[in-house]
C-alpha cells in the first residue's frame, strides 16, 4: 500500500477527496490522509509542530475520522511513502512567507519519517470574481495571483530539494480551455470562488497528485468520480494534467 500524508488545510482536503479512489482505478492501493485545519499556513503548521497541539482533524480517503491528532502523532505512525507541504492560499504569492517554516517542517518530516519523500503541493489562484478577503493582496487579479504563487512555490520547493505537485498550474491551464473558461461562459472550477468544484476541480487535483506521486500516466486511468460526470470533460482534464506534469518533468 502506498501511503500519503498531506500537511495542509481545505485545499489539500480538495486534493485528496478522490485520490485513493483514482489510484485504485490505476491498480494502486493507496491510503490518503489529510491533516486539516482551515486556512492553515506554514507558519502555523510550524508553531503546531513545536507545541504538539492536537489541532488537526484526521481525514482518510476523503472522509473525516472524527478525531484530532498532532503533527508528531501523525508522522510517527510511520509507513508514509510521501508527505506533502503547502502554503495557505492567502500567503501563496509571497516568497518571504514560506521561510523559514518550509525548511523547518521539511527537516522535521525527514528526521521523523526518513523513508518518506517530501513533496510540495502547489495551491491555485482564486476565481476571477472571488470574494475571498485575501484576493485584494493580488489586486483581485487571478493571473497576477497565479504568476506570484507559481514563482513562490518553485522557489520554496527548490529550497528544500522537493518535487512540486503542480496543482495550481493544472487549474490555470484548464481555465484557458473553453469548457472551463469562466470569463467567457465556461464553468468555474471553484465552488465558492476559491475552493475546488466538488466534481471536476477535485478530480483534476487527484489526477495531478496521482500522476506525480505514482509516476503513472493518468490518461490510462478509467476512474470516474460520479455517474453525472461528462466523459469528454474528464478526458480533457486527464490530457491537460498529463501535459502539465510532463512539462514539469522535462
Language-model segment annotations:
Residues 186-250:
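Conserved catalytic region of serine esterases and O-acyltransferases that act on ester linkages
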Amino acid at each position: 500500500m502506498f501511503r500519503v500524508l498531506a500537511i495542509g488545510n481545505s485545499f489539500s482536503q480538495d486534493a485528496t477527496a478522490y485520490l485513493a479512489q483514482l489510484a485504485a482505478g490505476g491498480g494502486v492501493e493507496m491510503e490518503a490522509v489529510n491533516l486539516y485545519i482551515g486556512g492553515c499556513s506554514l507558519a502555523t503548521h510550524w508553531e503546531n509542530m513545536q507545541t504538539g497541539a492536537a489541532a488537526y482533524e484526521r481525514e482518510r480517503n476523503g472522509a473525516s475520522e472524527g478525531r484530532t491528532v498532532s503533527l508528531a502523532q501523525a508522522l510517527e505512525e510511520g509507513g508514509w511513502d510521501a508527505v506533502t507541504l503547502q502554503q495557505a492560499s492567502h500567503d501563496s504569492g509571497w516568497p518571504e512567507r514560506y521561510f523559514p517554516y518550509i525548511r523547518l517542517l521539511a527537516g522535521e518530516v525527514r528526521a521523523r519519517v526518513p523513508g518518506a519523500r517530501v513533496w510540495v503541493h502547489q495551491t491555485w489562484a482564486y476565481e476571477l470574481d472571488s470574494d475571498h478577503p485575501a484576493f485584494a493582496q493580488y489586486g483581485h487579479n487571478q493571473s497576477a495571483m497565479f504568476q506570484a504563487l507559481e514563482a513562490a512555490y518553485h522557489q520554496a520547493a527548490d529550497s528544500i530539494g522537493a518535487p512540486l505537485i503542480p496543482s495550481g498550474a493544472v487549474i490555470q491551464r484548464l481555465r484557458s480551455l473553453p469548457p472551463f473558461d469562466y470569463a467567457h461562459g465556461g464553468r468555474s472550477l471553484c465552488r465558492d470562488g476559491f475552493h475546488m468544484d466538488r466534481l471536476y476541480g477535485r478530480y483534476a487535483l487527484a489526477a495531478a497528485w496521482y500522476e506525480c506521486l505514482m509516476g503513472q500516466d493518468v490518461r490510462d486511468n478509467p476512474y470516474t468520480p460520479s455517474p453525472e460526470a461528462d466523459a469528454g470533460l474528464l478526458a480533457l482534464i486527464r490530457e491537460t494534467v498529463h501535459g502539465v506534469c510532463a512539462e514539469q518533468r522535462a
